[in-house]
């Protein structure tokens, strides 16, 4: 606070009271007048016949001056430390000071005549003591107490340096309160930065303890010296009017405080570098809006409500201010183009990188079970750890009862009740039912997991997840590792799922049957639609039409403004202002809260379109392809087929179905000539060209080449024609010149489809072609098959592809191939009945 100018100094209260001045003036007062007053004061003290009334008056005035001096010194000390006291003359402190002075004060006697000489400027304290010496000692102790318990400022400091210093002083606290706060802070460090903070505080406290002088010695001398120096320089600071302090933000800091500030800034730099290193090591970054008080109250709710979260991967933003809403008991399908972050979102939910309510147990089925000696059924049962603990306790208590310990009977009864409540008796039957539905026969259910392939171990993992029934079950492409029969069972089983479900799938038929809601990932946001995938598709198409109309209307308005003489910038600004007014009007009408996001000009809605095309073949006389009297079996195994006899024409549309392991893929290899029959022969037209899509398609690609180079080398195509062919099958232009080994599974599949088209086949033989394709690409494949004039033989677990292409169903069973009478719904019913399941007929929403 600036002081009055030197020309009109405030008159000190002690001027003119030479007769009643106290000895404290020798220590506290300043200037040449001080010395004169001190001299007069000693002369007055020498008079031994002082009246008793004058002595009492001196004591009263002495107490008043002490209070004034205390206030002045405290104010200077607060100014020096960057503090501001809201109420300097606190009533409680005054009473305490008065009581202390009364205790310390002594009547006029010989002791008072032994007043020590004033302290020299060097700060060396002379021996002896009186009322004022005791007061100075108390003041130094109060300063120590204030350093231990700094008073809370009434108003926050504007200078951030002061704030940093006050924060830096906290680790040096040595009082009871400081110890309690320190112990609380050390109890549970949240992360490595918090632990580093605690370590830094400990180091600072040790440094301060080492450098701290004795309380009764150097510290008091130092403080007295600082006080006298500041008082001596006070008049010069008044002349400057506080300008130097305003210019220099560090002017009010002592050397000790500057040293602490330097240490604090160095610590902050270390923390910042650690955070930067941590961010560089992690590929993903997540941010989320702070939860409101209402959301915090609903932490135990069964629903999930996450607002304004963002996720980026490898520097690419996947979600920006997106909202996630999941209602308990509903079954959600998460859809969107490949590579936009669907799987990433599931992993962040499972890892609780997002704020999921703690009472919701989350399970993401993504890893296959460990390959060991554990039978498949036991691997499923062991997932329920609670049941295992209860069974172990049951055995222990039964052993105690057999030994005559009757005290275990009561606890054993409670264990039985818990086992009944969890359905422990039916646990094994439930596990075997799930395994059977996923394609495990009784012998396979008891087979050790180490004897299964990766795909079958993935099925065991899926069975464990279904057996556990978590509050929120998340499945990422669950049908990829399943055959058609297992997909039919899983589809039917999940329609009766009573808990919350979140599925990522490219199987439109699966989403139509299972899901009650669709979450669409589009433009880094999540959009919600009630109903199954078919309902979503209709609503989304309508929404895109409306957006296109609004965009065209906006472009028309911009064109009119430009024609009227407005620049492009001015026209866009005026259009944005009109959008803002319209947005505010809608908010007032709907009584919505104001959005902080400024309206942006509409962009043309992007239609994600993929179109597959296969060139039409020339006509060939039937039969173009067939197996006659074929028997085949792998060496050392029983035959898969016996006496196969059938032919295929140019207009054939055949889907081969059956459980895994019966030989569907083997049958396709026999038709392509890649396998030679044990008996019989494969016959084909001599002009026939076969296009074969193998589900192990990566083996036929040259990984070191780019897609463009691969097609150019194989078919002698010009550069532009090769790129056009890749573009027709939905491969992005930037991927045309990237090495095939760096492409995703879906991108590699598109390269193989482009290669098939370049071969101009007469017959398409496709083994699980929908793996790694998104829904739009599967639709495009179905349309291409329908338009294709040649024969098509497909093995697929995608029900919609089968039904959309009107394929005849040929089932492989009992070493033979036979055609099914009826459609796909009849086949589904037949599969479920064979498993002892009842077909669920869910009404479409």
UniProtKB/Swiss-Prot annotation:
The keyword Ribonucleoprotein does not apply. Residues 1-261, 559-602 are annotated as: Disordered. It comes from the Eukaryota. ATP 1 binds at residues 336-343. The keyword Cytoplasm applies. One of its GO terms (biological process) is translation. Changing residue 664 to M: Does not inhibit ribosome binding. Reduces ATP-binding. Inhibits ATP-binding and reduces protein synthesis. Shows a reduced association with polyribosomes. Does not inhibit IRES-mediated protein synthesis. Induction: By TNF in cultured synoviocytes. Changing residue 797 to L: Does not inhibit ribosome binding. Residues 227-241 have a biased composition (Acidic residues). Changing residue 745 to D: Does not inhibit ribosome binding. Keywords: Activator, ATP-binding, Cytoplasm, Nucleotide-binding, Nucleus, Phosphoprotein, Repeat. Isoform 2 is phosphorylated at phosphoserine and phosphothreonine. Isoform 2 phosphorylation on Ser-109 and Ser-140 by CK2 inhibits association of EIF2 with ribosomes. GO terms for molecular function: ATP binding; ATP hydrolysis activity; ribosome binding; RNA binding; translation activator activity; translation factor activity, RNA binding. Residues 29-39, 73-85 have a biased composition (Basic residues). Belongs to the ABC transporter superfamily. ABCF family. EF3 subfamily. Isoform 2 is required for efficient Cap- and IRES-mediated mRNA translation initiation. Isoform 2 is not involved in the ribosome biogenesis. Isoform 2 interacts (via N-terminus) with EIF2S1; the interaction is independent of its phosphorylated status. Isoform 2 associates (via both ABC transporter domains) with the ribosomes. This is ATP-binding cassette sub-family F member 1. It comes from Homo sapiens.
